[in-house]
């Protein structure tokens, strides 16, 4: 009887390992929260040392400090009303989130790509909706 219990417990542990790995590779909830609040300082805590940024006419790879300034400027000019997460997923070590950012000046499509809980790419583009 102990052998059966031990085998069953081992089987359950082995099955749960892929689930734990998938959980850890999602876009951090703090990123979603920072977008919803329009908080560039909170978002900067998740930026990689260099991040590909597409916001307005800014389209390049920027240092964390430069990217934080550009994001803060965007949030100053476009006060955030809400952020709605539309889709998220992951593959290998990367994860992504796609959503709609509603601001006082219009709606924007947001795409976030992360690796190891750090934002590698952030795109905020005017939505056609």
Describe the role of every protein-language-model region.
Residues 24-39:
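Short, aromatic-enriched amphipathic alpha-helices that serve as compact interaction elements
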Residues 56-58, 103-104, 115:
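Short, flexible beta-strand-to-coil junctions
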Residues 1-26:
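Bacterial Sec-dependent N-terminal signal peptides
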Residues 54, 100-102, 127:
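A generic structural motif
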Residues 69-107:
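Surface-exposed, charged secondary-structure patches
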Residues 42-43:
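Solenoid-repeat scaffolds in large eukaryotic assemblies
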Residues 107-129:
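Short beta-strand edge/turn micro-motifs at domain boundaries
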Residues 26, 47-82:
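Short solvent-exposed beta->alpha transition segments
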